[in-house]
Amino acid sequence: MSTWANLGLQDSASPLMEQLIFFHDHALLILVMITVLVGYLMFMLFFNSYVNRFLLHGQLIEMIWTILPAIILLFIAMPSLRLLYLLDEINEPSITLKSIGHQWYWSYEYSDFNNVEFDSYMIPTNELSNDGFRLLDVDNRIVLPMNSQIRILVTAADVIHSWTVPALGVKVDGTPGRLNQTNFFINRPGLFYGQCSEICGANHSFMPIVIESVPVNYFIKWISSTVNS
């Protein structure tokens, strides 16, 4: 989750988020190089004393400023396209989770198991425990197994919502009447926080998401106890 004075992205908890961070750093490096080059050229133009009133055209410089940006765009586009295909790929999921957005809470269904569904509301500030996070903790967490391919189906019951967990690199719009899907792979245990990322009304800020990532054997015990209860 985001912490005070956090300048970078959140620590990744999935391979896809690691790739997104690498691409961010790659694109930022290119932007810094362009900024330095343009700044150097502007500095030289402002402070040199050379004047050439007879320079009307220059084929070489025109070729350079046409070809160089095209090459730079290729260096940005190729890894970007690769990432787009990776984000859309569904790899034989071990478990499917369905998330339904409401004004203003989430409801979840574990499609592979019978009778495993629940609503997830934000815990009000006056009911938080001492170690809780304001506006981020919920009464019912999503429990998912680590080191497993997970497919999530997202929709909405009323208006457009967006199911987002930054540490996993996941952001899926929930649209009434449509079913969007993506997959992710959690590579470490822990709690991962997210929020609705689409303005959906007065209490849009109060729709947190909490994923509890646990080893597979703990997940099986949790599912068994939930089904039996």
Curated annotation (Swiss-Prot):
<dbReference type="GO" id="GO:0004129">
    <property type="term" value="F:cytochrome-c oxidase activity"/>
</dbReference>
<dbReference type="Pfam" id="PF00116">
    <property type="entry name" value="COX2"/>
</dbReference>
<dbReference type="InterPro" id="IPR014222">
    <property type="entry name" value="Cyt_c_oxidase_su2"/>
</dbReference>
<dbReference type="InterPro" id="IPR001505">
    <property type="entry name" value="Copper_CuA"/>
</dbReference>
<keyword id="KW-0186">Copper</keyword>
<keyword id="KW-1278">Translocase</keyword>
<comment type="function">
    <text>Component of the cytochrome c oxidase, the last enzyme in the mitochondrial electron transport chain which drives oxidative phosphorylation. The respiratory chain contains 3 multisubunit complexes succinate dehydrogenase (complex II, CII), ubiquinol-cytochrome c oxidoreductase (cytochrome b-c1 complex, complex III, CIII) and cytochrome c oxidase (complex IV, CIV), that cooperate to transfer electrons derived from NADH and succinate to molecular oxygen, creating an electrochemical gradient over the inner membrane that drives transmembrane transport and the ATP synthase.</text>
</comment>
<keyword id="KW-0999">Mitochondrion inner membrane</keyword>
<keyword id="KW-0496">Mitochondrion</keyword>
<feature type="binding site">
    <location>
        <position position="207"/>
    </location>
    <ligand>
        <name>Cu cation A1</name>
    </ligand>
</feature>
<feature type="binding site">
    <location>
        <position position="200"/>
    </location>
    <ligand>
        <name>Cu cation A1</name>
    </ligand>
</feature>
<feature type="binding site">
    <location>
        <position position="196"/>
    </location>
    <ligand>
        <name>Cu cation A1</name>
    </ligand>
</feature>
<feature type="transmembrane region" description="Helical">
    <location>
        <begin position="63"/>
        <end position="82"/>
    </location>
</feature>
<dbReference type="InterPro" id="IPR002429">
    <property type="entry name" value="CcO_II-like_C"/>
</dbReference>
<keyword id="KW-1133">Transmembrane helix</keyword>
<dbReference type="InterPro" id="IPR034210">
    <property type="entry name" value="CcO_II_C"/>
</dbReference>
<comment type="similarity">
    <text>Belongs to the cytochrome c oxidase subunit 2 family.</text>
</comment>
<feature type="binding site">
    <location>
        <position position="204"/>
    </location>
    <ligand>
        <name>Cu cation A2</name>
    </ligand>
</feature>
<dbReference type="Pfam" id="PF02790">
    <property type="entry name" value="COX2_TM"/>
</dbReference>
<feature type="topological domain" description="Mitochondrial intermembrane">
    <location>
        <begin position="83"/>
        <end position="229"/>
    </location>
</feature>
<keyword id="KW-0679">Respiratory chain</keyword>
<dbReference type="InterPro" id="IPR036257">
    <property type="entry name" value="Cyt_c_oxidase_su2_TM_sf"/>
</dbReference>
<feature type="binding site">
    <location>
        <position position="161"/>
    </location>
    <ligand>
        <name>Cu cation A1</name>
    </ligand>
</feature>
<keyword id="KW-0472">Membrane</keyword>
<feature type="binding site">
    <location>
        <position position="196"/>
    </location>
    <ligand>
        <name>Cu cation A2</name>
    </ligand>
</feature>
<feature type="binding site">
    <location>
        <position position="200"/>
    </location>
    <ligand>
        <name>Cu cation A2</name>
    </ligand>
</feature>
<feature type="binding site">
    <location>
        <position position="198"/>
    </location>
    <ligand>
        <name>Cu cation A2</name>
    </ligand>
</feature>
<keyword id="KW-0813">Transport</keyword>
<dbReference type="GO" id="GO:0005507">
    <property type="term" value="F:copper ion binding"/>
</dbReference>
<comment type="subunit">
    <text>Component of the cytochrome c oxidase (complex IV, CIV), a multisubunit enzyme composed of a catalytic core of 3 subunits and several supernumerary subunits. The complex exists as a monomer or a dimer and forms supercomplexes (SCs) in the inner mitochondrial membrane with ubiquinol-cytochrome c oxidoreductase (cytochrome b-c1 complex, complex III, CIII).</text>
</comment>
<feature type="topological domain" description="Mitochondrial intermembrane">
    <location>
        <begin position="1"/>
        <end position="26"/>
    </location>
</feature>
<dbReference type="GO" id="GO:0042773">
    <property type="term" value="P:ATP synthesis coupled electron transport"/>
</dbReference>
<keyword id="KW-0479">Metal-binding</keyword>
<feature type="transmembrane region" description="Helical">
    <location>
        <begin position="27"/>
        <end position="48"/>
    </location>
</feature>
<feature type="binding site">
    <location>
        <position position="198"/>
    </location>
    <ligand>
        <name>Mg(2+)</name>
    </ligand>
</feature>
<feature type="topological domain" description="Mitochondrial matrix">
    <location>
        <begin position="49"/>
        <end position="62"/>
    </location>
</feature>
<keyword id="KW-0249">Electron transport</keyword>
<keyword id="KW-0460">Magnesium</keyword>
<protein>
    <recommendedName>
        <fullName>Cytochrome c oxidase subunit 2</fullName>
        <ecNumber>7.1.1.9</ecNumber>
    </recommendedName>
</protein>
<dbReference type="InterPro" id="IPR045187">
    <property type="entry name" value="CcO_II"/>
</dbReference>
<keyword id="KW-0812">Transmembrane</keyword>
<dbReference type="GO" id="GO:0005743">
    <property type="term" value="C:mitochondrial inner membrane"/>
</dbReference>
